[in-house]
Amino acid sequence: MEKINRITGFFRKTVTGLICSVLLQSAFLSDASAASISLISDEETEQFLARQLRPVFKAADIPFNRNNIYIVNDDSLNAFVGDGNNMFVHTGTLMKANDENEIAGVLAHETGHIMGGHILRQKIKLQNMQQISLASMLAGGAAAAATGRADAAIAIMMGTQSSMLNAMLAYQVEEERSADESAVKLLQKTEQSPAGMRNFMKKIDRQNRLNGIAENPYFRTHPVTAERISFLNNAVRQSPFPAPAQPSNEFLRIKAKLSAFMEEPRKVLQKYPPSDKSTPARYAQAIVFFRMLKLNQSLKILNELIAEEPENPYFHELKGQIFMETGKIKPARTEYQKALSLLPNSALFQINLAQAGLEDNPN
C-alpha cells in the first residue's frame, strides 16, 4: 500500500509481516503480531544507496536489484536485511553518519549477514525455539496438574524461556562477529577503508551510553563489544585504503535533504542557517521554507540552485513537488517532465509525472 505524505511529498509505504533478520525484537513475534514499519521512497537517496551497495554485492557474488533497497522512516541508528536480499536502512543512519564510508561499512556488515545465510539460520532457530517453548508450556501444565501448584508450571516455563533467550543472544553475537569479518573482506575487495565501519560502531556505543544503556548484548540487536571494536581497529591499521578526508558533496546533500524533510523546521535552520551558502545548506533551506509555506523564499533559493546546476534532476523534482503541493499543476508537470528527461529510468519520477497528468486532466 502506498500513499503520498502531503507534508513532505515523500512516498510512504507500510510493510506488515515478520522481518526475519538479525533483529532481536522480532525473534519472538509471530507472523500475526509483527509490527509494521514505515518506508520512505526517495529517488536521490535510493540512487546513492544503490551506488554504495552495488559493488559490495558484486564482491559478495550476490545479484543486485535496486528494488531491494528500502529506507525506513526511523531516526535510530540501525540497518538490517530481510528475505530476498532486501536491505533496510534507517533514516537515522543516513542522517547521523559522518560520511559515505560509514554507510559503506554498515551496508558491508549487513551484506555479511546475507553471505553467512543468517536469515535462514535464524528462521530455523526460531522454529526450534517455538517448539521448545510449546514443550515447556505442556510440561509446566503437567507439573501443575500433578502437584496442584501453579508456581511449578511458572518456574518451568520461566527457566526454559531464560535458557532460550541466552542461547539466542549468544548465537546472535557470533553472527555479528561473522558479519564483521565478512564486511572487512568486502571492503577490502571494493578498495574501501573499514574505518567508517569502526567509527559507526563507536557512534552506536556512545549513543547507548548517553542513553543510559550499558553495553549488554542481551538487550541490543547489534551488540557492540570491545572485542568487535578491537577487531576493526586492527583491520583499519592493516588496510591499504585510506578513509575519505571529507564527506562527498552528494552525501552532504542527502543528509541535508532528509533533515529538512523530517526534522522540526527550527532545528533544520539551526543546522543549516541562511548564512550558510553551501549547496547542501541551501537545498535544506529550500525544502524547509517550503514546509513552512514560505514559498517565495523556497523558490528563490531553488531557482538559484537550478541556475547553477540545470542538469540536476532532483532540483527539478523538488520544484515540481512544490508546485504540485500548492495546486499549480501545469508548472508541476513541466518540472517533473524535466526531471524525468534527466533521469529517464526513474520509476518514481514516472509516477510523479503520471500523477500530475491525472490532476491536470482528471477525465
Per-range role (PLM):
Residues 13-27:
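Bacterial N-terminal signal peptides
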Residues 29-36:
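Boundary at the C-terminal end of the N-terminal hydrophobic targeting segment
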Residues 36, 41, 47, 69, ...:
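Extracytoplasmic and endomembrane cell-envelope/extracellular-matrix remodeling and assembly machinery
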Residues 71-85:
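Catalytic zinc-binding patch centered on the HExxH motif and its immediate surroundings
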Residues 89, 105-113, 117, 179:
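Active-site recognition of the HExxH zinc-binding catalytic motif
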Residues 91-105:
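Short pre-active-site segment immediately N-terminal to the catalytic Zn-binding motif
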Residues 101, 111-128, 146:
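Catalytic Zn2+-binding segment of zinc metalloproteases
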Residues 131-146, 151, 155-167:
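Membrane-active amphipathic alpha-helices enriched in small hydrophobic residues
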